[in-house]
Amino acid sequence: MWKGDENANGGHCLVNWQTVTRPKDMGGLGVPDLERFGRALRLRWLWQEWVDESKSWSGSELPCTDDDRLLFNSSIIISLGDGAKTKFWHHGWLDDQAPKYLAPNLFRLLSRTNRTVQQELRNNNWMHKLARKITSPIHIEEFMSLWIRIQDVHLQQGIQDTITWRWTNDGNYSTRSAYRIQFRGSLLHFGTDLIWKAHVENRCKIFAWILVQDKILTAQNLQKRGGPHQQQCVMCNGPLETSLHLCLICPFAKAVWNQILTWENFTQIQQQQNANPTHIKSWWEDVAAKAPRAERRRLNGVAIYTFWHIWKERNRRIFDNRSETVPQVAARIKEDIEQRKRAFDYI
């Protein structure tokens, strides 16, 4: 959409789409992933198939993929009753695991795998089907392992099988939990509350989110992309512009920070400002950790506005060929902070 072409992959994107679609508390921007969201909705059919047989479509073939069923089966805890609903091979009813994963080589020998636990345990039907097909030591090993586990299973006639959803406190399915679980394992490299709970506009939050990932189009990042760029920092005529240099190390940026931190009375943060930070993320987390808990949201808002206006000043110098002094940039930051306070009536 932004590129204007039918396909815009790779270097056209500041942040990859997989990161953008993560929930905010998992390091993403919270833009819905339609594929994952669609899967979460389809899982609702599988849930309803278990818990509500009165649905008009109950018993019909559901438009769910193998991946949908795999996610669903790993998301439920089955409590066996009479075994009439639970699939012997596909559901995780045996020590919380599905027999097809406990005995994968045996599973490959079978042609009919959709029978229920009740059907297969009756008269040990599952054993009779496999007895004539076992041909190797691995088959025997898996057969014996499965047989030993099944000895502890006792069906309860007249009591239906029930399921519990793993990802909610009340054990019931929710679309939100089904969506979020698909992002489990995403690595979080930054305390996202520092951005998303700050008292600043969304455009500034999104900029800060891009900044902490070192994806804003500084001279260094433009150089990596093969684009035109300044060879020196336009703020101080120093080294090649990086996110870290522009926002924290550049003498111009340091002077702006000193004015803002003095004005906001963050004296303990000014000492941190004199250190040599190695990354914006680690610097930000360190100064937030040193601030009193009651002051952290305000500090985060001040930090984002400062980053934002340093970036805007950099762009003025490059694209508009005009510049402002340190006091002028600091005044813009103070004005935004004061307007935000008045708009939301907080101090």
Question: Language-model segments: what does each one mean?
Answer:
Residues 1-347:
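A helix-boundary/hinge signal
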